[in-house]
Amino acid sequence: MASTNTNLQKAIDLASKAAQEDKAGNYEEALQLYQHAVQYFLHVVKYEAQGDKAKQSIRAKCTEYLDRAEKLKEYLKKKEKKPQKPVKEEQSGPVDEKGNDSDGEAESDDPEKKKLQNQLQGAIVIERPNVKWSDVAGLEGAKEALKEAVILPIKFPHLFTGKRTPWRGILLFGPPGTGKSYLAKAVATEANNSTFFSISSSDLVSKWLGESEKLVKNLFQLARENKPSIIFIDEIDSLCGSRSENESEAARRIKTEFLVQMQGVGVDNDGILVLGATNIPWVLDSAIRRRFEKRIYIPLPEAHARAAMFRLHLGSTQNSLTEADFQELGRKTDGYSGADISIIVRDALMQPVRKVQSATHFKKVRGPSRADPNCIVNDLLTPCSPGDPGAIEMTWMDVPGDKLLEPVVSMWDMLRSLSSTKPTVNEQDLLKLKKFTEDFGQEG
């Protein structure tokens, strides 16, 4: 109960201090204090407040403080922008009570724009995924095209002047699990000076009529404000399929807005790259397809890339596999995607755990101590067959937690997992993708 009073008192103190700063005209300090106060109030409502009446009263106060914070934020934004936007004397019209030019740009729909842009803020990838180009096995053509479109224009802007302009739209297509989204993660990591928007259909589709296309428009406006920007749309076919008589009016309007924003009259998309990914490119609308200037096929990995994937997925886990074993695994997995190989390795990594679970005998071995890896001890226990010299009859339940030395991953574990994992891509889909590549794409 004491902590409730402490947090509530802290929130009340912050709110009264914010009101004082607000009255004194120190709007920046007031804004920060209002925001902190609201955070404390919300914490109290969520975890500490007792009774509906108390919660209702705190929520009402929160709404009041949030409204004031929004007004202050808007005022401070306008104050920053005003010197940058000179108005010709003959054009300066009457000013309304809010301080807006009545015949200038209408600011009445600003709150709506702000609300839509706030919805899209969650799509901005702030924490960069830690995926480097070297983590992507194979796909050299796709990597080069992405470096050409994203990294080079940021590092050497002087190269892209006059008629030489970077690519504005790149479509990655191919079977599921081949690394299209993984490549996008690598782009997000490597393009560290760019704003990266990761968009799915749920970010742009709204139940309210007319709001979806406004979200699309605001997405591109947000990208222009924060350029250089990359807009990554995963499973773009769900938003931009072929237009037909049977589709809904809302879907048609989203598509039209996409077409206008990607390459419309009076639209400046300098410094913006739209990156799309799909498994079924043949369902894309032809006009959307044309907006993606580069269409790169991400095929199933070849034998050498598959061998590299086994190596990458095993990482630093102790194993007894040789280079020849990796090459053999690469040859044996023809028709498997990168995601399939990841599942094989994950299953193989569980095989030593299963050996521990099913073992009836353990033996003492030398190995690094759990407490200090630099110290070698002689009393670790590892699973063994009943006929092994020094075999002790016991189950894993009898082994002390810090004394277990699990078996290393072996080629036998890999082959066992491979035999129980089937490829997820069928021949029919591959033929369709190859046909699409021949007609419209290029090999990655």
UniProtKB/Swiss-Prot annotation:
Modified residues (Phosphoserine): 102, 108, 410
Residues holding ATP: 174-181
Catalytic activity entry: ATP + H2O = ADP + phosphate + H(+)
Family according to the record: Belongs to the AAA ATPase family.
GO cellular component: ATPase complex; centrosome; cytosol; endosome; Flemming body; late endosome membrane; midbody; nuclear pore
E.C. number(s) listed in UniProt: 3.6.4.6
A GO biological-process term: nuclear membrane reassembly
Subunit comment: Proposed to be monomeric or homodimeric in nucleotide-free form and to oligomerize upon binding to ATP to form two stacked hexameric or heptameric rings with a central pore through which ESCRT-III substrates are translocated in an ATP-dependent manner. In vitro, associates on the inside of a helical tubular structure formed by a CHMP2A-CHMP3 polymer. Interacts with CHMP1A, CHMP1B, CHMP4B and CHMP6. Interacts with CHMP2A. Interacts with VPS4A; the interaction suggests a heteromeric assembly with VPS4A. Interacts with VTA1.
SMART domains (alphabetical): AAA (SM00382), MIT (SM00745)
UniProt keyword list: ATP-binding, Cell cycle, Cell division, Coiled coil, Endosome, Hydrolase, Membrane, Nucleotide-binding, Phosphoprotein, Protein transport, Transport
Gene3D superfamilies xref list: 1.10.8.60, P-loop containing nucleotide triphosphate hydrolases, Phosphotransferase system, lactose/cellobiose-type IIA subunit
A GO MF label: ATP hydrolysis activity
Domains (record comment): The MIT domain serves as an adapter for ESCRT-III proteins. It forms an asymmetric three-helix bundle that binds amphipathic MIM (MIT interacting motif) helices along the groove between MIT helices 2 and 3 present in a subset of ESCRT-III proteins thus establishing the canonical MIM-MIT interaction. In an extended conformation along the groove between helices 1 and 3, also binds to a type-2 MIT interacting motif (MIM2).
Protein name: Vacuolar protein sorting-associated protein 4B
Species assigned in the record: Mus musculus (Mouse)
Record region (Disordered): 77-118
Disulfide bonds listed in the record: none
Keyword Transmembrane: no
Subcellular location: Late endosome membrane
Tissues where the protein occurs: High level expression seen in the kidney. It is also expressed in the heart, brain, spleen, lung, liver, skeletal muscle, and testis.
Signal peptide span: none
